[in-house]
């Protein structure tokens, strides 16, 4: 069962068709977070992002939350993880993020977009692509 608010009536529209994101979206989502974070970086006020980004599609645990933050997200949702594994994934993720921050003596604000600023795809060396042998030409 799914629900989406109708913008005209402002009432919920209920249906049985629901799409669920998942961990398979993590690399793609991190890529686009980094791209958008970099594009918006010049549009800041007092060093704070004018448009905070939310990482969605793929966060399963605290490590994934950290990956989203490093890619440029200011917040991360974990709806698919909660649906599949229950709300306990949230407290475990929070603990993992807290432990990571403490072990590196840093704060969340210092992580946001840090990986997006390191290297762009155009700057990466051309890698061997062993998977190409499995693709029809």
Which residues does each PLM region occupy?
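Glycine-rich beta-to-alpha transition loops that act as phosphate-gripper elements at the mouths
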Residues: 46-63
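Electropositive phosphate-/nucleotide-binding environments in soluble metabolic enzymes
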Residues: 23-30, 87, 91, 105
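Generic structural signal for well-ordered alpha-helices
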Residues: 30-37, 65, 90-94
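Hydrophobic faces of well-ordered beta-strands that scaffold small-molecule active sites
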Residues: 36, 52-57, 76-78, 107
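Extended, intrinsically disordered, low-complexity segments
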Residues: 26, 43, 95-137
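Glycine- and other small-residue-rich loops at beta-strand/loop junctions that grip anionic moieties
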Residues: 21-25, 54-58, 79-81
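Glycine/Thr-rich beta-alpha phosphate-binding loop at enzyme active sites
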Residues: 1-46
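Glycine-rich phosphate-binding active-site loops on the catalytic face of alpha/beta enzymes
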Residues: 1-2, 58-59, 64-92
């Amino acid at each position: 069962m799914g629900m989406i608010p109708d913008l005209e009536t402002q009432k919920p529209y209920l249906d049985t068709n629901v799409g669920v994101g998942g961990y398979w979206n993590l690399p793609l989502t991190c890529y686009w977070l980094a791209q958008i974070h970099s594009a918006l970086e010049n549009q800041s006020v007092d060093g704070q992002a004018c448009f905070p980004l939310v990482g969605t599609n793929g966060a399963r645990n605290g490590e994934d939350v950290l990956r989203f933050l490093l890619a440029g997200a200011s917040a991360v949702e974990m709806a698919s993880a909660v649906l599949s594994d229950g709300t306990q994934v949230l407290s475990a993720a929070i603990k993992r993020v807290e432990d990571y921050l403490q072990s590196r003596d840093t704060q969340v604000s210092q992580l946001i977009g840090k990986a997006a600023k390191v290297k762009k795809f155009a700057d990466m060396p051309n890698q061997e692509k062993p998977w190409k042998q499995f693709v029809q030409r």
